[in-house]
């Protein structure tokens, strides 16, 4: 396993790398490639994005051992979940590469998810010709299906969101902290992740919290995209936190997990979450579901 890396650069570090060009991004891509987890396909992908705050964020593709590739985390999805972890609400430009010199457009799945960010159609996508010698910029709208129009009155991905949910078992609130994003309690972190998750179509918010063998907690919330393609499930969102902040650990070091979701929603994450964790986590990993309404 590669040495741990930081998946976010502050604005001062970002400025030191200069303009968002292939030449300046190449060393960043090459730094991130060893942190991709593409054991099945052998095809690493890195996404680099620059936020409106001036910070730089990384995303890498993550394939889950023993599971079909449709459960994988795309580099662009990882990037968006990483933005959410750092409360970044706007992506100014994005670059995607497999080797540090050829830059390509986002895949069709991820174009749909990227479009969920407000004003994302104007975000610049860095592209190069096959030789990687010349960089050009194209708007994300170029790659979106015709007729896909954002609804102005619908909440957008990465915007501050608060789902009005409460745990059905009220006795659990005795153990819920006021500032759960900074605590190390699984129930708190999973509830917080569900509260700020993005599910405007299904109205089924959900969140997952994981704990490793050292006692460190990671969390993530559902990111929904039903226009044409797939969403990012809460387990995968929590795994982004694990990969980005888990010091390069293997998934087998995950020893407990909590899912918070609606009791009688139109969809459930429980079966998928259980299947993923049974495959990748510690064989004795404890998995609990807390229902909300």
Swiss-Prot record:
Substrate binds at residues 61-63. Keywords: Hydrolase, Metal-binding, Zinc. Homodimer. Its EC number is 3.5.4.5. Residues 20-151, 181-293 form the CMP/dCMP-type deaminase domain. It comes from Arabidopsis thaliana. GO terms for biological process: cytidine deamination. Its cofactor is Zn(2+). The active site is at 76 (proton donor). Binds 1 zinc ion per subunit. One of its GO terms (molecular function) is zinc ion binding. One of its GO terms (cellular component) is cytoplasm. Zn(2+) binds at residues 74, 107, 110. Belongs to the cytidine and deoxycytidylate deaminase family. This is Cytidine deaminase 8. This enzyme scavenges exogenous and endogenous cytidine and 2'-deoxycytidine for UMP synthesis.
């Amino acid at each position: 396993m590669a040495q741990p890396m930081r998946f976010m650069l502050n604005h001062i570090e970002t400025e030191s790398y200069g303009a968002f060009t292939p030449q300046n991004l190449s060393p960043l891509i090459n730094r991130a490639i060893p942190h991709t987890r593409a054991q099945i396909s052998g095809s690493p992908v890195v996404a680099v994005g620059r936020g409106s705050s001036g910070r730089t964020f990384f995303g890498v593709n993550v394939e889950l051992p023993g599971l079909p590739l449709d459960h994988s985390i795309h580099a662009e999805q990882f990037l968006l979940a990483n933005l959410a972890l750092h409360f970044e609400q706007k992506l100014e430009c994005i670059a995607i590469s497999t080797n540090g010199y050829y830059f390509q457009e986002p895949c069709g799945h991820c174009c749909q998810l990227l479009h969920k960010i407000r004003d994302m159609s104007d975000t610049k996508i860095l592209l190069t010709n096959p030789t990687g010698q010349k960089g050009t910029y194209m708007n994300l709208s170029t790659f979106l299906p015709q007729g896909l129009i954002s609804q102005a009155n619908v909440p957008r991905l990465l915007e501050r969101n608060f789902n009005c949910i409460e745990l059905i078992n009220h006795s659990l609130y005795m153990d819920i902290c006021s500032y759960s994003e900074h605590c190390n309690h699984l129930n708190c972190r999973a509830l917080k992740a569900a509260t700020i998750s993005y599910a405007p179509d299904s109205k089924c918010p959900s969140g997952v919290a994981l704990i490793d063998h050292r006692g460190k907690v990671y969390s993530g919330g559902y990111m929904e995209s039903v226009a044409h393609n797939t969403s990012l499930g809460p387990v995968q969102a929590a795994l982004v936190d694990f990969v980005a902040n888990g010091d390069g650990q293997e998934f087998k070091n995950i020893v407990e997990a909590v899912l918070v979701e609606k009791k009688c929603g139109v969809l459930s994450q429980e079966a998928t979450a259980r299947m993923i964790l049974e495959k990748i986590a510690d064989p004795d990993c404890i998995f609990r579901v807390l229902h909300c309404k």
